[in-house]
């Protein structure tokens, strides 16, 4: 079984940060920052709230996992050829599988757009604060999500079951990107979006599993988001 490269302290930090990202921020993030803004005497809009949380999480993840990130950087540079090959293969498979799934959903349910790209670029925040939103989508979110979901959770679960590692992280990744949009109205449309988000979830997990460097799925995730924006 491949080593997760994680210390016990990093695993504890990963649990806490993942719970903050998956539960605390979606449920209470707006209320917390609105309360803080009230104390300081100014209003914090949705775009600024997103930026603040992403910066805070980025800093926390970098601090908690700095040793792990350094180890993965060594793996990347030590096997540069394999690393770049994995990155290229991941991008090819992402767009190939995404196109296949798009055509299948179009054939079965008649959708005429790529749901993955639509879910990403139709965010109201992109119009409200384009620079901050692009920074979050292309830099901050890929770093945070890949370190927490792939580096921490996938790496930890892989020590016990590779199949469980793929399954759990793919489901979490898909739900993370659809649940907030769907709210209480999780219709077929959002189920199809979740299925399409399972594609990058699978590809990014494979990229980390094959390269053993978290920088590869981070780069792949950033590239996919940049092209979608």
Model-found features: residue ranges?
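Alpha-helical transmembrane segments
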Residues: 10-28, 88-94, 166-172
């Amino acid at each position: 079984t491949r080593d997760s490269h994680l210390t016990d302290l990093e695993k504890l930090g990963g649990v806490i940060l993942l719970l903050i990202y998956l539960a605390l921020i979606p449920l209470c993030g707006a209320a917390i920052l609105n309360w803080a803004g009230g104390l300081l005497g100014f209003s914090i809009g949705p775009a600024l709230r997103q930026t603040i949380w992403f910066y805070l999480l980025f800093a926390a993840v970098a601090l908690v996992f700095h040793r792990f990130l350094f180890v993965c950087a060594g793996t990347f540079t030590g096997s540069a050829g394999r690393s770049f090959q994995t990155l290229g293969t991941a991008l090819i498979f992402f767009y190939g599988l995404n196109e296949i799934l798009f055509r299948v959903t179009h054939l079965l349910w008649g959708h005429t757009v790529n749901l993955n790209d639509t879910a990403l670029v139709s965010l109201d925040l992109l119009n409200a604060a384009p620079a901050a939103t692009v920074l979050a989508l292309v830099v901050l979110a890929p770093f945070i999500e890949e370190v927490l979901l792939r580096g921490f959770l996938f790496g930890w679960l892989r020590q016990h079951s590779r199949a469980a590692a793929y399954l759990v992280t793919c489901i979490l990744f898909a739900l993370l990107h659809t649940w907030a949009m769907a709210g209480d109205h999780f219709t077929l449309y959002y189920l199809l979006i979740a299925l399409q988000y399972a594609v990058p979830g699978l590809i990014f997990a494979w990229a980390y599993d094959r390269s053993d460097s978290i920088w590869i799925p981070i780069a792949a995730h950033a590239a996919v988001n940049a092209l979608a924006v």
